[in-house]
Curated annotation (Swiss-Prot):
The keyword Cell membrane applies. This is Sec-independent protein translocase protein TatA. It comes from the Bacteria. GO terms for molecular function: protein transmembrane transporter activity. It comes from Chromobacterium violaceum (strain ATCC 12472 / DSM 30191 / JCM 1249 / CCUG 213 / NBRC 12614 / NCIMB 9131 / NCTC 9757 / MK). Belongs to the TatA/E family.
Amino acid sequence: MGSLSIWHWLIVLLIVVLVFGTKKLPGIGKDLGNAVKGFKEGMNEGAKDGQPPAKDAGRIIDGEADKK
């Protein structure tokens, strides 16, 4: 019950086709692919900068320290 079977995915695909039509689906897929590609390039660009990620100072706020 927790996972989606192939039938669930087919029903979702059918609803998407009915809502958007077959003409718009390639454009939506292309836009989604470009978004994922841009995200991956941005993540790789951040890693190539050579700067280590900033560390959190680990401050303790008085309200949090009393609640433990």
